[in-house]
């Protein structure tokens, strides 16, 4: 091996030169300079010296045998990194680099493992010895505590059974009790310290010098003695377990004896305080140490699901329903999705859907009604109690349009109402009170047009007698049959008035025969229906008709309660510009006074004025009296009940409740419709829609017009009435029509000045109508214009194939004779064989001799080339046809 210098060797080993020189001097090699040479023998001598140990190594933890316990090695390494240097903003050219010197220092320490294991073993043995000493102390304390507890128990039993001794026992037991408590506390402290000794390091324990000495002695014992110590430790563990079990059994027995001795204690207890009470409390502490631990309460998970009774109103939101079931809204929405219902957290659902969801979630639904206050009001008005008086009959005149209902009533009233109606047809329910020699009667005139079915149904429900007017020259018509059905549904008697008897073609027997087919049998034919022949023009039979009505009313014995809150029904409602909402009301029971608080549907208010059919203001209206009521908060629906209530606050509450319930139901229905039509809406682009906005003079007309227009909907064109209302057309109506691109229809109403200006500025489509026929017909024509036209095929002519030729230019050519009609060049054709279509296509060529022609008529021969078809045979027929677009209509 080549010799190295001291400095080179120091760099190789990784230690300072000064330290290497000191080690060489300590090894007896003398002090050497940095450049002095080191031979292989010098290095071996230095290594032997280092292995034997040196004072420096002894300081670092060298062993007594000369071998080092810990060796620390240090190394250094140098390297260079080239990094790009910064460049000025104005400079150009390649980027400069700079060199960075890097020095890495490493230090590793090696420790002798055998010494570490010996140290850990020593510490563990010391901990075991300390634990054994503490265990012995614990056993002594437990034995002492058991003796004290047994002595206290004997003293307690003596106190329970003794009479006078019970008073002396507390004072005698006070001292042992006070002594027993510290001992128990000491025992607990010992237990805690024992746990800490086992868990902590030996240096952190409270072991003293004696424990360490015993541990050292234990280390020097032979292996047999260690086995004996292990057996003794196991024996101590077993005894401690037996002692613990015995203590628990005794505690249970003491608790049972105390439970049995409770009645005796109550007899033996004397009212005493101070020391005696304290002794009793101390006795409880002594006896209940272990029992207190056993009686400690713990939370137990429910083994069965909690079933709740969930109250469900008529409409409820998803969030509220989830809250009532104590589940998360997300879980409820997930369950709804399983049921096929898509909903949001704030969406309202109906009662039936909510009940199904509650059952699916494992709870019990309880259906709840929101109209308790409303039912109370209805019960008050259903059975009015009080003095009953006779009332005038309510007579409804029904029949087909143009059969003379209003003219008949005009003659009875001596008025001209029919001439004032637009188009000469009735479009409102008219209520009139007629005074006669035989008494008074209230007549209701209903529309006969098919659009007013709801009006006729309402008229039949609120009447006592139905006068069915049938024209003698026209017979039974569709609305006549409908009127009979309404009367039967309402169980109202019918009086038939065969009108227009003054005409030459009048045939009353035909009317009787047609009505008898509907089971309306005249009295002269053995039935129970009165037939009266009348004429509204000449007045023929009017007295007989009134007599028949009076007779029918007498048979019914009509009564009404006089002294009760007034109750009636709304015949019609309209919005008057000067008077506000106006409701035409037929009073049925009680007297309606000015100033009464009334409620009708979702509207309420105080009666400001009462106006009769002649336009005069009255202070009250009795049973069977039609009257106009002013003062309601809004327009009630026709057919709604109206009743007087004493408390205006209750009326407001019921009206608001009805309005809210109606709104929620409407929202729920709209949402349900959206869900049901989810897939049909995907094809909505293919369906055209006509949006309409309807304003009418009265509620009944608006309702009839809206229903009639919506019934015009077609599978290709849908009619949607975005809004319908009562009153003049306002600026807000025009804005709504602009937003929804709707056509505005004014039925017997006009637009105000602001609305007219907006209509002219924005070009809104606005139409005025006074006859319902015209409005329906106009919309029907608009729908027909939006329908896609159909294609119909018209056969132009037929040619019979006589011979088939082959051409170099055209291929197969059929020599034909046109037997019917005309064959044109640019029209489609069909090839028929044995009257069966085998090919559909078009002509490629049509020639007469050698000339191309556009058409060939019947009886003329021609040559026909069929495009893309080469299987024409003699005897086939070539049919020429055209497709024509035909406009569809409803």
UniProtKB/Swiss-Prot annotation:
The keyword Translocase does not apply. CDD domains: IF2_eIF5B (cd01887), IF2_mtIF2_II (cd03702), mtIF2_IVc (cd03692). SUPFAM superfamilies: Initiation factor IF2/eIF5b, domain 3, P-loop containing nucleoside triphosphate hydrolases, Putative DNA-binding domain, Translation proteins. Residues 424-428 are annotated as: G2. Residues 445-448 are annotated as: G3. It holds the Pfam family GTP_EFTU_D2. InterPro entries: DNA-bd_dom_put_sf, EF-G-like_DII, EFTu-like_2, IF2_assoc_dom_bac, IF2_II, IF2_N, P-loop_NTPase, Small_GTP-bd. Residues 535-537 are annotated as: G5. Keywords: Cytoplasm, GTP-binding, Initiation factor, Nucleotide-binding, Protein biosynthesis. GTP binds at residues 399-406, 445-449, 499-502. It comes from the Bacteria. GO terms for molecular function: GTP binding; GTPase activity; guanosine tetraphosphate binding; translation initiation factor activity. Residues 399-406 are annotated as: G1. Residues 499-502 are annotated as: G4. It is found in: Cytoplasm. Residues 390-559 form the tr-type G domain. Residues 112-125, 136-147, 217-262 have a biased composition (Basic and acidic residues). GO terms for cellular component: cytosol. NCBIfam families: IF-2 (TIGR00487), small_GTP (TIGR00231). HAMAP family: IF_2_B. One of the essential components for the initiation of protein synthesis. Protects formylmethionyl-tRNA from spontaneous hydrolysis and promotes its binding to the 30S ribosomal subunits. Also involved in the hydrolysis of GTP during the formation of the 70S ribosomal complex. Belongs to the TRAFAC class translation factor GTPase superfamily. Classic translation factor GTPase family. IF-2 subfamily. This is Translation initiation factor IF-2.
